[in-house]
């Protein structure tokens, strides 16, 4: 289950690489924190390797700039993750509105789990070419529960919203995803929602390898 920890952009062409740390079911060893690994791909890979050595899974969420070097830096990140032997322990978010279908295909070919982000129309267009990619769904979007039901057999990242209504929608969507045969991921830093997700996973017979 995952808490989204995006990087922050400080320039027009450089990318900072944020990443999140999935929390295994039934164990929250310390409060979740925000991590920004640095401005270079090697920074992200170095810190990711440290977390993997602690027994964690890592989700890298690059925030690329809009310059000509954005695609090159992203390609370098993919190559370095693979060279470092982190493919089995990392998933990589591809901002398809900035980097497009080629970047998503490169990640998939490298053997990394892919999470697609961006405007829904862009994500859906790229998803058709990248089977198995995780599709983000916000719990406070109109019709989120219905869309989660349509996608429940695949890999869905559920994004938590804000407020009591969003929390209730989160739980409804969670019930749909956890009871299906897919691979749900939970994107929140709210320990209460993480605990609920753990309870729902256990109720549906899921172990940490199933989420």
Language-model features: locations:
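Positively charged, amphipathic and often flexible ligand-engagement surfaces
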Residues: 1-211
């Amino acid at each position: 289950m995952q808490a989204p920890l995006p990087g922050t952009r400080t320039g027009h062409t450089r990318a900072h690489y944020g990443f999140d740390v999935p929390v295994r079911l039934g164990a929250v060893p310390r409060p979740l924190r925000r991590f920004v690994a640095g401005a270079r791909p090697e920074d992200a890979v170095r810190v990711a390797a440290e977390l993997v050595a602690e027994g964690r899974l890592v989700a890298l969420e690059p925030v690329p700039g809009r310059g000509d070097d954005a695609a090159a830096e992203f390609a370098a990140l993919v190559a370095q993750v693979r060279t470092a032997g982190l493919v089995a322990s990392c998933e990589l978010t591809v901002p398809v509105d900035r980097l497009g279908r080629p970047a998503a295909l490169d990640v998939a070919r490298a053997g990394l789990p892919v999470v697609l982000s961006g405007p829904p129309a862009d994500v859906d267009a790229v998803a058709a070419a990248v089977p198995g990619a995780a599709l983000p769904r916000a719990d406070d979007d109109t019709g989120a529960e219905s869309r989660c039901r349509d996608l429940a057999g695949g890999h869905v990242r559920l994004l938590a919203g804000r407020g009591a209504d969003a929390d209730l929608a989160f739980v409804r969507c969670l019930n749909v995803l956890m009871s299906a045969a897919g691979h749900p991921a939970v994107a929140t830093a709210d320990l209460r929602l993480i605990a609920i997700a753990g309870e729902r996973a256990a109720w549906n017979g899921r172990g940490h390898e199933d989420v």
